[in-house]
């Protein structure tokens, strides 16, 4: 060893003239290449045959996907236009096109959609490599729960309808019993399929699957349109019959009387009470089917294929938000019960309208201030924006903005009617304030929810940071003690940053819980009760009976859907805070 150390160092080999020439040439070539690169653009590097062939296949696959989406979208558009033409013809020309004709068309569409749903479950999903990925963001539990709840209510609605038709079987056609039976079977199977497969990203039979999804979506959309228009016609006919009965009381006989008055009253009240849920069920099915259509042939990364880690739903010490929300809920239930009791009589006293609108005027500005405070806290946070492509979140935003147009449209029509007639009366001033505050509350709440949905959850960066640190440092450090010390240091740093953001998290959770309870209250009142927008008579006298009925019956279901969808979005904001 000593001899090896004391030995003289070997002299470095001298480069040969050829090597010098080669080295000089290479340096000259390199300088020349740099000059060419700086002066003029280099010619593109030629790709290999495999890379060119692979990119060509990818391009053809994208073109095939776009063609399939275009064709299925056109199919749905034509079906909706055909059904819309039938429904409009039924409204404006009741002699040539009757309600029975529309039912026949919808029954044919339901049977076709039913056959596709069964084939999708039995055939498509059981093929090899059919469902390689499942979208973790699609079909959250509140959407599937609402699907089952509203689907069950709609099935009960059709049972009440069949019972009512059976009690009048002596003056009604027996064929009319077939349509509710088909709808019951269709809704049961559709709810079951959507519950099981709403997260699927199908990779086989993509074009056929897209067409089936669009056909089912168009069928649900036409069911919603018919439910809204048929409800308005039913209310109009009922109001006209009541007026005729008051005018000609005791004169004439009704040939279609129920044989058992008590049973018919149960069927009629059950049908009227459950009717709003059918419109909500159709809207939710359309949203779920659209997400499934967007997920056809979609490929997800390995880490997004599984269910992401989610923060559990805990109160985290929130006090004021739940208390204020429960206070609004109790007050809303009291106002709702008083108004419903008064509405069961022949006329509603003016003071109950004042109480109803005064409750809204008190709650809506509080919700708007809470939304503005939450949006400001989002701006103060250090969380990054989540810019990844997410079809479910994009659909949530579109549905949130679109559903808000329902009640906002009614509010704008009310503002015009009040300002143009008698804006100085107390009730009219309350309705005017209610309409303005409703528009403001929708805008601020949409801003708060959309801002929260596009923020990364607070727990996500810490978990991923610790995992990346483990992956990087594990091969480098051999001591488990040093690794434990690093993990403890990372935990202390996370706890320190958590304590600094704690007040923001708590404020966001307080605001989210308060808004959740308020939206539940504002969802319950129009969904289960009488609509003051029609009963107060102001807008009805200004726009006319048929026009205002159409506006209300198209706007209110969207408003109910907006409140329910807002609750789901606020739950996501609460969990991500």
From Swiss-Prot:
Swiss-Prot/TrEMBL catalytic activity: H(+)(in) = H(+)(out)
Residues in the Extracellular compartment per record: 91-100, 163-174, 230-276, 340-353, 417-427, 529-547
Top-level taxonomic group: Eukaryota
GO biological process, alphabetically ordered: proton transmembrane transport
UniProt-recorded Gene Ontology molecular function terms: identical protein binding; proton channel activity
Cytoplasmic membrane side: 1-69, 125-140, 199-206, 294-319, 377-394, 451-510, 571-577
TM segment ranges: 70-90, 101-124, 141-162, 175-198, 207-229, 277-293, 320-339, 354-376, 395-416, 428-450, 511-528, 548-570
Cell membrane as UniProt keyword: yes
Keywords attached to this entry: Cell membrane, Hydrogen ion transport, Ion channel, Ion transport, Membrane, Transmembrane, Transmembrane helix, Transport
Regulation of protein activity: Activated by extracellular acidification. Activated by Zn(2+) under non-acidic conditions.
Main location: membrane
One Gene Ontology cellular component annotation held by this UniProt entry: membrane
Stretches for region Disordered: 1-46
Keyword NAD listed: no
Localisation per UniProt entry: Cell membrane
Tissue/organ expression: Expressed in epidermis, small intestine, stomach and retina.
Topology class, membrane: Multi-pass membrane protein
Quaternary structure and interacting proteins, as annotated: Homodimer.
Entry's family note: Belongs to the otopetrin family.
Role description: Proton-selective channel gated by extracellular protons.
UniProt protein name: Proton channel OTOP3
Organism for this UniProt entry: Mus musculus
Gene name in the database record: Otop3
């Amino acid at each position: 060893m000593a001899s090896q150390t004391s030995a003289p160092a070997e002299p470095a080999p001298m480069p040969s003239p050829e090597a010098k020439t080669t080295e000089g040439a290479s340096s000259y070539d390199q300088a020349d290449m740099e000059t060419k690169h700086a002066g003029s653009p280099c010619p593109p590097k030629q790709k290999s045959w495999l890379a060119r062939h692979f990119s060509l296949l990818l391009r053809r696959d994208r073109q095939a996907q776009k063609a399939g989406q275009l064709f299925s979208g056109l199919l749905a558009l034509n079906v909706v236009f055909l059904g819309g033409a039938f429904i409009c013809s039924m409204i404006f020309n009741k002699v040539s096109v009757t309600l029975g004709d529309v039912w026949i068309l919808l029954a044919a569409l339901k049977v076709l959609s039913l056959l596709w749903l069964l084939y999708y479950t039995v055939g498509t999903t059981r093929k090899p490599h059919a469902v390689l990925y499942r979208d973790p963001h699609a079909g959250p539990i509140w959407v599937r729960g609402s699907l089952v709840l509203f689907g069950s209510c709609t099935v009960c609605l059709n049972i009440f309808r069949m019972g009512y038709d059976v009690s009048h079987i002596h003056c009604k056609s027996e064929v009319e019993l077939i349509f509710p039976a088909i709808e019951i079977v269709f809704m049961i199977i559709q709810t079951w399929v959507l519950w099981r497969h709403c997260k699927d990203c199908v990779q086989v039979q993509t074009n056929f699957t897209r067409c089936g999804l669009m056909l089912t979506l168009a069928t649900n959309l036409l069911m919603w349109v018919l439910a809204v228009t048929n409800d308005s016609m039913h209310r109009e006919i009922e109001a006209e019959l009541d007026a005729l009965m008051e005018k000609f009381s005791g004169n004439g006989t009704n040939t279609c009387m129920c044989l058992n008055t008590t049973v018919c009253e149960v069927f009629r009240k059950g049908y009227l009470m459950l009717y709003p849920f059918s419109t909500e069920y159709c809207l939710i099915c359309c949203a779920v089917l659209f997400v499934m259509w967007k997920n056809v042939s979609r490929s997800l990364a390995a880490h997004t294929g599984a269910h992401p880690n989610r923060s559990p739903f805990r109160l985290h010490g929130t006090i004021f938000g739940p208390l204020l929300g429960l206070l609004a809920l109790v007050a809303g239930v009291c106002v709702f019960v008083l108004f419903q009791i008064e509405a069961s009589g022949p006329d509603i006293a003016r003071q109950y309208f004042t109480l109803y609108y005064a409750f809204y005027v008190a709650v809506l500005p509080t919700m708007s201030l809470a939304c503005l405070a939450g949006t400001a806290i989002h701006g103060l946070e250090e969380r990054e924006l989540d810019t990844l492509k997410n079809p479910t979140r994009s659909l949530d935003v579109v549905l949130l903005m679109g559903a808000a147009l329902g009640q906002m449209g009614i509010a704008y029509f009310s503002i015009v009617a009040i300002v143009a007639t008698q804006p100085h009366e107390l009730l009219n001033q309350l309705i005017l304030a209610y309409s303005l505050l409703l528009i403001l509350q929708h805008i601020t709440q949409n801003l708060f929810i959309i801002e929260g949905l596009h923020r990364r959850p607070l727990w996500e960066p810490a978990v991923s940071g610790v995992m990346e640190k483990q992956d990087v440092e594990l091969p480098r450090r051999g001591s488990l003690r040093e690794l434990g010390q690093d993990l403890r240091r990372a935990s202390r740093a996370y706890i320190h940053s958590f304590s600094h953001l704690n007040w923001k998290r708590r404020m966001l959770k307080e605001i989210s819980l308060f808004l959740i309870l308020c939206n539940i209250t504002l969802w319950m009142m129009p969904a289960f009760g009488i609509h003051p927008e029609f009963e107060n008579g102001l807008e009805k006298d200004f726009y006319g009976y048929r026009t205002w009925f159409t506006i209300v019956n198209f706007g209110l279901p969207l408003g109910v859907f907006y409140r329910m969808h807002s609750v789901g979005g606020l739950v996501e904001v609460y969990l991500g805070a």
